[in-house]
Amino acid sequence: MKQVMMIKFDSPKWRMIDEYKVANPFIEVGFRQVKDVVDLRVFDLLNISRINNNRAEEMLLCIYHLLQPDRRIDEGIYNDEIDQYFSYREWKKKQQPLSGVTVREILTTEDLNEGALLRIFDGVTAAFYKSDEYNSREYRYSNLSELRKAMKHKEGGTNGKAQ
């Protein structure tokens, strides 16, 4: 996984899996490599301008495909050839509160498959939209740099909002 974290979004290896140029809006707001995304809480990722839940979901799928290049299990599940049950309810119990879930925690879930990834992301996203961290009128952060500054301020005792 460590090698995957260092893959840059402008590298040929990334472009092989990112056929729809999912990384472009991420690059525009300051993301440079996979590690930049994976280290964030999902709630923070969804609070960055131009990163809506669809783009975030597509990014998680691209990273998942880097981590799991063999797609046979996912294709088998999709085609009802393989039955691999995943309990979102059990996962959610282990992860409470959902506001603290990071992208890394989702991607490193035991027995993760593409369907489970989407179910987990949908659940965390639903929790985000019900939370106090969501504001339908504005994003908290205009770019990754602003988010990092806010995180440093939060560690210093402020409320975590960008100044």
Name the predicted role of every residue range.
Residues 1-136, 140-154:
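Compact, charge-rich alpha-helical regulatory domains located at protein termini
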